[in-house]
């Protein structure tokens, strides 16, 4: 998975002129980290509890927020996009070892398609003097990303379900998923911040 992810990032960067959104080139170190965390998402995605509704309870949003908090917004976004791309081409990286475009077009596909935005928001790091304030803002941004995922997922679910309205699905999500996802998101930002520090000191991240 890491090798496939690395190739995908290189192809994506070359197609965009060899640069990231911030204008800096991706080096081997960055590509390796992106591939590694795409692999981390693959592992986390297999942890799920099936539900009668067809939408499993997972800790995937923990993984998305973690990737953003550790890698930062650019690399976190790319790692999530790479994960989705390698799943879309058929590798079994989605939950329950599924793969293929059909997963993205299915009932839960809207949630997956919202993940890059959540990773991006989770990776924005304020640079104010107060570390507590910085962490609080990171958590709020990650929670905003989580709500974006819940909304995009509910939109696609409602369109495919036909007999369920968007408001009904969101109401159900507020009861069944959002409280759990919010706790996991907050935890992921805190844990991710701690993981990032030694990586920065070692020179793997800036």
Predicted regions and their residues:
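Short helix-perturbing small/polar motifs within transmembrane alpha-helices
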Residues: 18, 32-36, 43, 101-149
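Residue-level signature of transmembrane alpha-helical entry/exit and packing/kink sites
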Residues: 26-37, 57-64, 76, 107, ...
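Alpha-helical membrane segments and adjacent membrane-interface helices in multi-pass membrane proteins
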Residues: 45-122
């Amino acid at each position: 998975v890491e090798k496939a992810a690395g190739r995908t990032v290189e192809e994506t960067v070359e197609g965009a002129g060899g640069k990231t959104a911030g204008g800096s080139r991706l080096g081997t170190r960055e590509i390796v980290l992106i591939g590694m965390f795409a692999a981390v998402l693959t592992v986390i995605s297999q942890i799920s509890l099936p539900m009668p509704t067809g939408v499993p309870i997972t800790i995937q949003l923990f993984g998305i927020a973690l990737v953003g908090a550790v890698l930062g917004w650019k690399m976190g976004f790319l790692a999530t996009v790479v994960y989705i791309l390698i799943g879309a081409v058929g590798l079994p990286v989605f939950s329950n070892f599924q793969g293929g475009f059909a997963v993205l077009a299915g009932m839960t596909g809207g949630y997956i398609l919202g993940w890059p935005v959540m990773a991006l928001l989770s990776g924005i790091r304020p640079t104010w003097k107060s570390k507590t304030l910085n962490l609080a803002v990171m958590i709020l941004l990650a929670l905003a990303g989580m709500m974006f995922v819940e909304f995009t997922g509910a939109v696609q679910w409602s369109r495919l379900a036909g007999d369920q309205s968007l408001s009904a699905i969101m109401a159900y999500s507020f009861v069944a998923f959002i409280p759990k996802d919010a706790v996991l998101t907050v935890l992921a930002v805190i844990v991710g911040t701690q993981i990032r520090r030694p990586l920065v000191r070692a020179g793997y991240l800036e």
